[in-house]
């Protein structure tokens, strides 16, 4: 289907550095029998572009929509529990190899959570509107921490809301992304995984923790997309290993690229 053939979207420096791509069916990954042999690709290698890194990440979760106080309340609690565990787990420990200069990557913490019910969401929302909401909430809602070099806002969308970003949309082009606002505010957006390409055969919570871990690790190592650790051909630390998962504790997370081990770990 068309919604399963789109892997990445691109803009001026490549939105692939921001997004979790859709999972492609195996049949679409296999070249035709009569296809010419592909040239050997050079192995991935992330290089540091001298931009900021998030050394001790402070995650604040925002759940947008009244559903998160009713039908999705239990899921919101589970997502917060995921961050409480994962931010001091071996998943974060393995990112230490990407420390650079004064940025020594270590454990983080979740600093809080809130549910946003206004403005009310319609059937789609743009990244511009998400940025506006976030900036407004930072300015007017005392529940939100002020942005710092370590602050990372994770924004979760309710079922039935399409997110539009970079000329593409959730469930037709991507499953999540991270971005920055003027290099000062770091955030990640998690659309509700309402399609097979964004669940990858996983249970709902597992799909969300997998994509959340993808964007978490990319935000830490490349908070301003393309200015931290990046590979021109393959994107960010999570892009190289998209939809390869493992368990950390009881949670499903995505494998991440290791320069030292030259593989997804």
What is the role of each PLM region?
Residues 50-52, 63-67, 157-161, 191-194:
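Short, flexible loop/turn elements at secondary-structure junctions
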Residues 55-59, 148-153, 183-186:
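Loop/turn elements at helix/coil->beta-strand transitions in domains of secreted/extracellular proteins
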Residues 2-137:
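N-terminal carbohydrate-binding/catalytic regions of secreted carbohydrate-active enzymes
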Residues 107-180:
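Active-site-proximal segments of metallohydrolase catalytic domains
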